[in-house]
């Protein structure tokens, strides 16, 4: 068992708020994408890694550009203004028929729509999954809370501290060492919020690595049902910006979205080149369809699907016999 440091809850809360000091950021990043929705098909090779440029700003605003490395061709661009999102799929690795401009609402649940896509059984299923799903399922807002942590709110929430030990692989141990598997201790800090009906719900869980100090290593965000919405892992720490004013912040962030079945890691290409604290105009977070791509409004698609389902149920329901 690795030796762990002790910390009171106040120190853990302060560490979350230290991360939350970042109000805006602009950075160039290396992106690595893993699409698990159709594991048997995999992902088009050139989309596994990409260059990215990201701009984030509170509250919940983000611009993300994804480019093919070396040739710097835009694969996708996406924005969210905190309420709505827009995704332009600019490259599909094929004929271009999967290029789209997708619009939707941050708070909406499009799981039902995704299930309809998953029912595809014709020859286009593989091409669709390889070339479109990787970016069509990405939502820019998935990355805002990973990069811009919300500060704690002790007036509105209850925070509960506990500890946990996990068996982990020690990459620093010698290859034949019997100590390659170690027990690492973590503090868990659960954020519990009171609902309108009086029930309590977990909204976030923070994991703090206790080995060699206290380090925020992971953030889990839960939905209204208590299921994991985002699982965010923070890598090794370093200093950001040219002057190094923002110290001991993660240089790599990994975001896993279980419902959308994908994982994205973001690594700063040049930590000293990161810009923090500037204010960006609202227009920067409102992507326009300058490419005249076919538009797909997910809210409209969802309404259409629900209407069809309702009509189908009515048609299937038995009618009383005429007397």
Predicted regions and their residues:
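Gly/Pro-enriched, hydrophobic low-complexity segments
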Residues: 1, 136, 152-153, 157-300, ...
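Solvent-exposed helix/loop surface patches that form functional interfaces
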Residues: 138-154
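Short, mixed charged/polar active-site loops
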Residues: 43-49, 73-77, 95-102, 200-203, ...
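Edge/loop elements at the starts and ends of beta-strands within beta-rich repeat scaffolds
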Residues: 16-25, 45-47, 54-60, 71, ...
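Post-signal peptide N-terminal segment of secreted/secretory-pathway proteins
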Residues: 31-85, 91-93, 287-289, 296, ...
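Intrinsically disordered, low-complexity segments enriched in small/polar residues
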Residues: 115-127, 167-180, 195-197, 300, ...
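An acidic-aromatic
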Residues: 57-142
């Amino acid at each position: 068992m690795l030796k762990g440091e002790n910390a009171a809850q106040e120190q853990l809360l302060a560490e979350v708020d230290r991360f939350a000091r970042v109000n805006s950021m602009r950075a160039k990043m290396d992106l690595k994408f893993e699409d698990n929705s159709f594991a048997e098909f995999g992902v088009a090779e050139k989309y596994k890694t990409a260059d990215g440029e990201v701009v984030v700003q509170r509250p919940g605003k983000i611009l993300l550009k994804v480019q093919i490395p070396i040739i710097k061709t835009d694969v996708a661009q996406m924005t969210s203004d905190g309420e709505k999102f827009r995704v332009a799929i600019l490259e599909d690795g094929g004929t271009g028929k999967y290029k789209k401009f997708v619009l939707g609402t941050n708070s909406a649940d499009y799981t039902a729509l995704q299930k309809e896509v998953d029912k595809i059984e014709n020859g286009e299923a593989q091409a669709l999954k390889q070339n479109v799903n990787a970016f069509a399922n990405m939502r820019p807002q998935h990355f805002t809370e990973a990069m811009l942590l919300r500060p704690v709110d002790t007036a509105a929430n209850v925070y509960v501290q506990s500890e946990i030990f996990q068996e982990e692989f020690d990459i620093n141990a010698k290859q034949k060492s019997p100590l390659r598997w170690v027990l690492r201790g973590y503090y868990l800090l659960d954020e519990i919020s009171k609902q309108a009906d009086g029930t309590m719900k977990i909204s976030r869980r923070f994991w703090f690595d206790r080995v060699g100090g206290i380090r925020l290593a992971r953030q889990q965000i839960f939905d209204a049902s208590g299921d994991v919405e985002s699982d965010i892992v923070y890598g090794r720490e370093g200093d950001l910006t040219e002057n190094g004013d923002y110290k001991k912040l993660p240089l790599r962030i990994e975001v896993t979205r279980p419902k959308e079945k994908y994982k994205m890691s973001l690594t700063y290409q040049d930590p000293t080149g990161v810009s923090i604290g500037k204010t960006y105009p609202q227009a920067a977070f409102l992507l326009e369809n300058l490419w005249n791509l076919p538009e797909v409004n997910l809210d409209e698609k969802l309404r259409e699907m629900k209407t069809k389902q309702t009509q189908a149920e009515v048609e299937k329901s038995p009618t009383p016999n005429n007397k």
